[in-house]
Amino acid sequence: GSLQVRGDISATMEVRVTGDVVVNGTMEAALVEAGGNVTVKGGIIGMAEAMQDNPGASAAATARTAHIVCGGDLKARFIANSIISAGQNVEVEREIRQSSIAAGGSVNVGAPNSQQTAITGGHTRALKSVRAGTIGSPAGVPTLVQAGLDPHADIKRSALTRKRLKMNEEKAKLEQLLLFLHSHPERATGDVVERARNTHTKLGRDLIQLDEEEAQLIRDLQPLHEATIIAARRFCGGAKIQVGNKQQEFLEDQVGGKAALEEGQIVIR
């Protein structure tokens, strides 16, 4: 079902629904998982130190980060120190600050051509396009913005690689067991050989299926050539953009424009 929250979602709360979530207030460092859309009429605000790259604070830091996973669109007034994964678009009114965003569609901050909005710090990834007034900040905060690769397929690919390793280990162990039982038939009590063979056959089938999933992912990871990144006002020094597989770093502030791929290179117009 769907859920309407009259006030705020406070820190450490966990919300899981199959439909949509609408929050009339703000959302702190909580967890929201929704099958549909998530709308936060206030802002989404994790705690400031949570997203800093401090390996020692990783578990505690995750607890202080706002975390949203939704199948549809995510809409909010602003997003700070949050981890967001949306199946479709991420629409923000004012600013995305020090957050990790993955969108299966586009990320838009403010209305088209609005000068006052910004993406500052963090890592923002979308399949189709990313748009804001300013990308980066005058203080030179490292900011990475990517468009043209499916962010979810990228995350999924690492998960599949781990799964394959585990399955291959299991298969090798079973093969050793079957060899051992073949040379010591007296140790093969009950239906142990049959069970091991069945499991081995099933693993073989699962690995073939994994190959198919990986092949599909590689197709999904083909860069989208019409992807764009737009900064209506400016790209700041310290920002890095990636369109498809091409990257460009800004060493100093540059007037805004639309970055796209032309003949395999990033061109800003």
Task: Go through the PLM ranges and name each one.
Residues V40, I45-R269:
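Intrinsically disordered, low-complexity terminal regions
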